[in-house]
């Protein structure tokens, strides 16, 4: 999986068309209303639903107010530069409420739990679980078979573009409410205890804890047993 360059992301945001998509429930004498091709109109003679850009739909509503009895607008963003990731082709388990922006890479059999937030350019390896309310900032990279605990934050780096992003190597367990700051690498097989604030690189196969996080021991059999990654949680239905 390839990490996006910060300048690529900046250019994408700069040059993207800023959009305010809306969903509008509409009621009235709709046979008298003409809808342009740029607006998706699922309507009958009396009612329906419109999908499109607010500026276009507002014009329709204003110009046809004598035919429209009532309408309700659903709107969740304004001048948004980055669309949400199209999830339909992703071979992972993604639960309701996860917010995943476009240009995120998600490996096979990964798990994204409710209300996780994953920003543009982030990379999630195969078999990795991102738990509830975790945040992966721009370009944060997590390897294979990891667990990022509930409420954890992996800081993002888009600006300044020269800054190094967070990198979490394979087989890492990050506890709940951990904060990993920009530029930190968490080495393969490491464990970060719940609530730690990680400001420096974590050596492979060590346990770190505290604020700021410090090495408290090397990984032993007891730690492995307590932080075991269960593949059963990552299984998907066979493809049909």
Curated annotation (Swiss-Prot):
<dbReference type="InterPro" id="IPR001451">
    <property type="entry name" value="Hexapep"/>
</dbReference>
<dbReference type="Pfam" id="PF14602">
    <property type="entry name" value="Hexapep_2"/>
</dbReference>
<keyword id="KW-0220">Diaminopimelate biosynthesis</keyword>
<keyword id="KW-0012">Acyltransferase</keyword>
<keyword id="KW-0028">Amino-acid biosynthesis</keyword>
<comment type="pathway">
    <text>Amino-acid biosynthesis; L-lysine biosynthesis via DAP pathway; LL-2,6-diaminopimelate from (S)-tetrahydrodipicolinate (acetylase route): step 1/3.</text>
</comment>
<dbReference type="InterPro" id="IPR018357">
    <property type="entry name" value="Hexapep_transf_CS"/>
</dbReference>
<keyword id="KW-0677">Repeat</keyword>
<dbReference type="Pfam" id="PF00132">
    <property type="entry name" value="Hexapep"/>
</dbReference>
<dbReference type="InterPro" id="IPR013710">
    <property type="entry name" value="DapH_N"/>
</dbReference>
<dbReference type="InterPro" id="IPR019873">
    <property type="entry name" value="DapH"/>
</dbReference>
<keyword id="KW-0457">Lysine biosynthesis</keyword>
<keyword id="KW-0808">Transferase</keyword>
<comment type="similarity">
    <text>Belongs to the transferase hexapeptide repeat family. DapH subfamily.</text>
</comment>
<dbReference type="GO" id="GO:0047200">
    <property type="term" value="F:tetrahydrodipicolinate N-acetyltransferase activity"/>
</dbReference>
<dbReference type="InterPro" id="IPR011004">
    <property type="entry name" value="Trimer_LpxA-like_sf"/>
</dbReference>
<protein>
    <recommendedName>
        <fullName>2,3,4,5-tetrahydropyridine-2,6-dicarboxylate N-acetyltransferase</fullName>
        <ecNumber>2.3.1.89</ecNumber>
    </recommendedName>
</protein>
<dbReference type="GO" id="GO:0019877">
    <property type="term" value="P:diaminopimelate biosynthetic process"/>
</dbReference>
<dbReference type="InterPro" id="IPR050179">
    <property type="entry name" value="Trans_hexapeptide_repeat"/>
</dbReference>
<comment type="function">
    <text>Catalyzes the transfer of an acetyl group from acetyl-CoA to tetrahydrodipicolinate.</text>
</comment>
<dbReference type="GO" id="GO:0009089">
    <property type="term" value="P:lysine biosynthetic process via diaminopimelate"/>
</dbReference>
<dbReference type="Pfam" id="PF08503">
    <property type="entry name" value="DapH_N"/>
</dbReference>
């Amino acid at each position: 999986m390839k990490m996006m360059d910060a300048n690529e992301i900046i250019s994408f945001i700069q040059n993207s068309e800023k959009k305010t998509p809306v969903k509008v429930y509409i009621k009235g004498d709709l046979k008298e209303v003409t809808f342009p091709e740029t607006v998706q109109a699922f309507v009958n003679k009396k009612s329906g639903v419109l999908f499109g850009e607010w500026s276009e739909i507002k014009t329709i509503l204003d110009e046809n107010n004598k035919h429209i009895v009532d309408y309700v607008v659903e709107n969740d963003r304004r001048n948004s530069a980055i669309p949400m990731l199209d999830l339909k082709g992703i071979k992972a388990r993604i639960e309701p409420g996860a917010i995943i922006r476009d240009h995120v890479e998600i490996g096979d059999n990964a798990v994204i739990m409710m209300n996780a937030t994953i920003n543009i350019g982030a990379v999630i390896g195969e078999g990795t679980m991102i738990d509830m309310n975790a945040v992966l900032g721009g370009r944060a990279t997590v390897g294979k078979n990891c667990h990022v605990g509930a409420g954890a934050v992996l800081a993002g780096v888009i600006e300044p573009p020269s800054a190094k992003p967070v990198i979490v190597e394979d087989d890492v367990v990050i506890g709940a409410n951990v904060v990993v700051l920009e530029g930190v690498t968490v080495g393969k097989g490491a464990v970060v205890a719940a609530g730690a604030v990680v400001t420096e690189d974590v050596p492979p196969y060590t346990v770190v804890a505290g604020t700021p996080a410090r090495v408290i021991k090397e990984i032993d059999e007891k730690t492995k047993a307590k932080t075991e990654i269960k593949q059963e949680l990552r299984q998907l239905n066979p493809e049909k």
